[in-house]
Amino acid sequence: MNYQQEFRNIGLQLMGNMDSEEWIELYKKLVYWELELSESEDTSIFEILKQQKIEANVQFSKYYEKNYQNWIRKESGNEPLLSHRLLSDKVFPHLKEDKPTFLIVIDNFRFDQWKALQPMVEEYLRVEKEDLYYSILPTTTQYARNALFAGLMPYDIKRVYPDLWIDEDEQGNKNQNEHLFLQKQLARHNMDIKTTYHKVLNVQYGKKMIDNLPNLMQNKLNVIVYNFIDMLSHARTESDLVRELAEDENAYRGVTRTWFAHSPLLEVLKFLSNKDVNVFITTDHGSVRVARPIKIKATKEASVNLRYKVGRLLDYNPKEVFAVAKPEDILLPRLNILSPYRSEEHTSELSHCQ
């Protein structure tokens, strides 16, 4: 089937009442055709796909807003897998096996980027299963990755571990306690195992990781976080040079492939390919390239993050944002008596787990 035939089917799906699994399958279709058509000389077909993807993003954002509160409170009965349940559902069951498990978390890593890298990964590893999960909101490292490692929503992290949670208005790295959150989650699941946690922020540390891999084979769980894709995503916004190198989504995937082909991460996978281990590759959240920014006016105390705003006296168009007056309603911590959250409506996204 070519895209011209698939176009009508996707259009009909978008007019229907899809559930979370059907949205995942639709997203997979759109990514498949985006990769297939990105090199096509027929730019008119690719433009049609881009418009269909924009429409899908709009509808998906509405779907997210309508269902999100029920999902996180498990009130719908058919909740998708969310960030805070990822490890307990997908990784922890494998820790009972008599072999080491390596969990590789690539910050801000999208599904289309994974599909672009998959052929290189499969030169060394066999992909046994590919799943997608839904990121919690806001889709930022501060919230999504802390939830992933803690196995709790941010509201509950602050409630249960107040000394470890760093609030929006506090100084310091908001993700500096991820390794402790992981230990706490393992303890809640009665898993007394040898675990290591590593955050790779530069090539030098990445190379040290390679040298240390033989020692990690003695542990039941080894977690390695890679931040390059997230840094690339931010540089794409802030640097003219990077913006030129990754001017569209196809070029962005190309930069990702180039990085991966020469990265210490690929060397890690090569090493693991000769060992009897479980390997999970996942992310904490994805990203969306915003073509039409939403204006939100706020006091100077409001958060500066581009994906969401929290603060007093926020002025915005309610049709353009997902607004929550009481943060605890979506299990986010309250900073003060007046701290509503506003998330741009057109930046919801799926995250994934391989």
Predicted regions located by residue number:
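Feature captures the catalytic ectodomains and active-site-proximal regions of enzymes
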Residues: 1-354
